[in-house]
């Protein structure tokens, strides 16, 4: 098996660049993000393709502008035929999505992601049954177990791929999408 770089994408709602120490902030304490930035690639000139949630996620996962990816506003699913980075990666990669999806049915693995844990269920909104999002079974399970939904990536979670949990050298790509608290 060819060794490739492991990829981790972290989405957080309403995250401004100037709230992180790696960009000069010295009063908001984010020790884990600081540590990650010290051992990772930190972008100096990154731009969001669209400031709205769904189109921004579509842009990041596909590499396309919103008008090319499909979702141009919230509550528009990513077209089934639209490929994401998970579908372009070599087969050696293990791919995972954890957290908010907002690009269609949150309940099922799709677009090349092999491991899938969603904290929300927007399917009823996408098919017009409701205007309010509901919480996924996974979200409700986390709450019942005493976790907050944003703890889906903690090391003690049983559904994490073993390669991520044990930090083995296999090739993996993880998207972690967190909600605003």
Regions found by a protein language model. Name each.
Residues 1-181:
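Formylglycine-dependent sulfatase
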């Amino acid at each position: 098996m060819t060794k490739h770089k492991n990829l981790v994408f972290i989405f957080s709602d309403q995250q401004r660049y100037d709230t992180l120490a790696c960009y000069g902030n010295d009063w908001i304490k984010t020790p884990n993000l600081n540590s990650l930035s010290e051992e990772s690639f930190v972008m100096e000139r990154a731009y969001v393709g669209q400031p709205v949630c769904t189109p921004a996620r579509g842009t990041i996962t596909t590499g396309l502008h919103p008008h090319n990816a499909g979702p141009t506003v919230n509550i528009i699913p990513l077209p089934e035929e639209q490929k994401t980075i998970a579908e372009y990666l070599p087969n050696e990669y293990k791919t995972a999505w954890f957290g908010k999806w907002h690009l269609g049915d949150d309940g099922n693995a799709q677009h090349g992601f092999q491991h899938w844990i969603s904290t929300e269920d927007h399917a009823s909104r996408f098919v017009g049954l409701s205007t309010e999002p509901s919480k996924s079974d996974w979200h409700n399970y986390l709450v019942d177990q005493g976790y907050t939904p944003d703890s889906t990536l903690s090391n003690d979670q049983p559904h994490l791929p073993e390669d991520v949990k044990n930090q083995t050298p296999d090739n993996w790509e993880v998207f972690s999408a967190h909600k605003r608290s």
